Amino acid sequence: MVILPMLAASPLSELLGLAIVAGVLGMRHGVDADHLAAIDAMTRCNAGARPALARRTGLWFSLGHGLVVLAVVLAVALTAHAWTAPDWLQPFGAWTSIAMLALLAALNLAAWRRTAPGAAVELTGWRSRLFNGALRACSRRAVMGVGVLFAVSFDTVSQAALMAATGAASHGLAAVALLAGAFVLGMIVIDGLNGWWVARLIQRPGAGAARATRVMCVAISGISLGTAALGAAAQLSPTVAGWAAKHSAWLAVAIVAIVAASFLAGLAVARRPSPLRLA
């Protein structure tokens, strides 16, 4: 969520434009390595005995996650008149997100390098490791509960609070609710598609599905590193920060387009019978 602070400086003045930006940023949040790792694990766990739940794991996970985001956003918006975010919150939250994105990208690329060409790559996330037992969730409520647990982190809460403070200051409570809803909807779309995608891959056992996971691992790691690099540059250079703020909507759209292309490429690779080495 490194790009989210750019929302505050976005040149878009129309509420609809801000809602679109918030929705696209929600899609970006949905491709965090922790989200993908958790959804992957729960989908695989339920694929055999509960295939219907497996296909909807991403949907229920993101709904639980989104409830926390909505609660934080509305709570901050309702108290915005009596509380002002400290100056250190935005840079601290940004650097926390930058560090987490860079670390997770490095871990996932290392896993990609270690994995044999014909084997599936398992995405890594610190929360997925911390809540490893919870990832065996075998009911809709349990999956939503995991989404709630994953939302209880400084980067998620701080960015939600920042979005609320920004929206409340410039557009009011109704606008805050719209922005938060658009953000959560974008996240639901990506996480829901990810759960469906993993379920489809499980139905296609063999080298093709394994190669597809390698495609996604490289794509997600690249997005994480690129986002971290841009966020760090924006924090260190006012010129870069201004450019990124001016083009924040297009940057977010580009990220989502890359994710969509990698999903489609993964499905195409999974269908190909001939071996394709990506390492």
Set out the residue ranges of the language-model regions.
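Small-residue-enriched transmembrane helix starts and helix-helix packing motifs
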Residues: 2-31, 54-60, 129-153, 174-183
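Divalent metal-coordination and catalytic microenvironments
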Residues: 32-35, 65, 102, 155, ...
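C-terminal regulatory/interaction regions
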Residues: 168-174, 190-279
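Juxtamembrane transmembrane-helix termini in multi-pass membrane transport proteins
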Residues: 14-83, 160-176, 201-202
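Membrane-interface helix termini and inter-helical loops of multi-pass transporters
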Residues: 6-7, 81-87, 235-246
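Membrane helix-loop-helix hairpins that form the core translocation module of multi-pass transporters
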Residues: 53-129
